[in-house]
Amino acid sequence: KVFGRCELAAAMKRHGLDNYRGYSLGNWVCAAKFESNFNSQATNRNTDGSTDYGVLQINSRWWCNDGKTPGSRNLCNIPCSALLSSDITATVNCAKKIVSDGNGMNAWVAWRNRCKGTDVQAWIRGCRL
C-alpha cells in the first residue's frame, strides 16, 4: 500500500508515535517519505546481505527475520513480511523498540540525512489529526 502523507500521519498518531521518545509526528512522516516514499511494500537489499522492509525500512540483520539474513538477531521478534502489511501495527511496534535503542532516530539514515534539523512540522501541515 502506498499511503497518502496525511493518511500515514494519522495511522502513526493512532499507534502512539507522536512524541514517542520525544520525536514529533513530523519526524516519523519525514523518515517514511525518504525511506520508502510511503510504500508499505518497499524492500531494499543492503550490501551486507540484509534487507530493509516496509514504510520505515526496518532491517533484517537486527530487527526482523526473513529467513535469509545470516546471523539475524530478530530483536522485534517478527517475520519481516509483517512489516510489509498495509496495517502498520508491527512496523510501529518495532520502530518504538529501535528508537529506544540508544541512537534515537539516527538509526534511520534517511532521517539523519534529510529530516534531522529541518522543519519536519511541514510534513503534517494541513492534515486533520
Swiss-Prot record:
MF terms (GO), sorted A to Z: lysozyme activity
Catalytic activity, as annotated: Hydrolysis of (1->4)-beta-linkages between N-acetylmuramic acid and N-acetyl-D-glucosamine residues in a peptidoglycan and between N-acetyl-D-glucosamine residues in chitodextrins
Any one of the GO CC terms: extracellular region
Active site: 35, 52
EC number: 3.2.1.17
Subcellular location: Secreted
Entry keyword annotation includes Hydrolase: yes
Domain of life: Eukaryota
S-S bridge residues: 6-127, 30-115, 64-80, 76-94
Keywords of this entry: Antimicrobial, Bacteriolytic enzyme, Disulfide bond, Glycosidase, Hydrolase, Secreted
Enzyme class: hydrolase
Subunit description: Monomer.
Note: Lysozyme C is capable of both hydrolysis and transglycosylation; it also shows a slight esterase activity. It acts rapidly on both peptide-substituted and unsubstituted peptidoglycan, and slowly on chitin oligosaccharides.
Functional note: Lysozymes have primarily a bacteriolytic function; those in tissues and body fluids are associated with the monocyte-macrophage system and enhance the activity of immunoagents.
Family: Belongs to the glycosyl hydrolase 22 family.
Protein name according to UniProt: Lysozyme C
Organism annotation: Colinus virginianus
